[in-house]
């Protein structure tokens, strides 16, 4: 695990101490690989999956991005039972070269980026509000609601993230994020531990405000893939929103001005990298990128932002 330093935290806004505190984290030295034993999935777990999926199905069809809708359509992700990793992984590999890696839970930065640069995407087969989830967190408190949990469960990993891996441009983008994270950690520029920690926080913030909680401008061209036209100005591409009924409803309510809970801000990669996040609550802001191509291009042109050398 990368040593944590607060030396440059004064550069951040919205600073949240221990932003992922309270989640079990696995590292290189842990037994982090945990194959899915599909025959062990219980009827209760299938029912939980089904309820989560069906609660979100119509909302996501109306408000999720085109990349998500097309990816979901091509994968065997059922709405009434757990998905089988062995059925999904070969299809993704054939499409974009990525594979699924079954893991025990949340991974630390070093392990996550090492896996990512190999085009492996970590997935778990534990699900919120299940006995296995309760057992994992029997000795520590964690939010465990149907609408939201900070633990990356199978619903978040597979239902929300995995469909995007069928899109070649998106898959290349998150691979480049992984490569950059690995480069920061290996510190070939010899910046030292304080700046490694700081630059990783910048990259984590960027990832949070984009592929976890990002929105893209709705230009109307995705409606042909929907049952009901999107009636707000944005499409959802952040997996943290997609897997959370509470978060999706918040986006829609705020976009329709039924709630003042969150604000919509224009995409600004420097501001995003320097703005910390709070995983324990519904997000108070969402950044809007003009297009997915704009996101990819911005990241490509601004990598030096993640190699801050101190001041």
Set out the residue ranges of the language-model regions:
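The feature captures two recurrent sequence modes
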Residues: 1-169, 284-311
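C-terminal structured domains
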Residues: 2, 6, 10, 227-228, ...
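Non-catalytic, well-ordered alpha-helical scaffold segments
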Residues: 86, 171, 175, 201-208
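Short coil/turn segments at secondary-structure boundaries
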Residues: 103-107, 171-174, 189-191, 220-223
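Surface-exposed beta-strand edges and their flanking turn/coil or helix-capping segments
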Residues: 115, 170-173, 188, 192, ...
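A structural signal for long, well-ordered, hydrophobic/aromatic- and basic-residue-enriched core segments
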Residues: 157, 171-177, 181-186
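Extended, Lys/Arg-enriched charged tracts that mediate electrostatic binding to polyanionic substrates
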Residues: 180-238
């Amino acid at each position: 695990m990368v040593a944590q330093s607060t030396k440059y935290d004064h550069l951040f806004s919205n600073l949240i101490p221990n932003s992922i505190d309270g989640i079990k984290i696995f590292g290189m030295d842990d037994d982090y690989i945990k194959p899915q034993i599909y025959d062990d999935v219980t009827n209760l777990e299938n029912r939980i999956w089904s309820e989560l999926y069906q609660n979100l199905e119509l909302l996501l069809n109306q408000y999720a991005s085109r990349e998500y809708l097309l990816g979901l359509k091509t994968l065997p992700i059922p709405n009434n039972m757990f998905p089988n990793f062995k059925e999904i992984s070969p299809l993704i590999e054939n499409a974009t070269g990525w594979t699924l890696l079954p893991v025990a839970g949340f991974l630390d930065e070093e392990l996550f980026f090492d896996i990512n640069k190999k085009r492996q995407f970590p997935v778990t087969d534990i699900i919120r509000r299940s006995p296995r989830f309760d057992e994992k967190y029997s000795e520590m408190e964690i939010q465990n609601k149907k609408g939201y949990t900070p633990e990356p469960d199978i619903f978040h990993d597979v239902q929300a993230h995995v469909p995007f891996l069928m899109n070649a441009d998106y898959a290349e983008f998150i691979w480049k994020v992984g490569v950059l994270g690995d480069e920061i950690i290996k510190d070939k520029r010899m910046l030292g531990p304080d700046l490694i920690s700081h630059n990783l926080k910048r990259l984590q913030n960027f990832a949070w405000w984009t592929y976890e909680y990002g929105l893209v401008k709705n230009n109307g061209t995705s409606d042909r893939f929907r049952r009901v036209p999107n009636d707000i100005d944005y499409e959802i591409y952040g997996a943290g929103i997609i897997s959370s009924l509470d978060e999706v409803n918040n986006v829609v309510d705020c976009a329709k001005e039924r709630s003042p809970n969150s604000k919509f801000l224009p995409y600004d990669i420097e501001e995003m990298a320097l703005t910390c996040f709070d995983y324990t609550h519904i997000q108070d802001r969402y950044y809007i990128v003009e297009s997915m191509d704009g996101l990819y291009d911005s990241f490509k042109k601004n990598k030096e932002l993640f190699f801050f050398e101190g001041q």
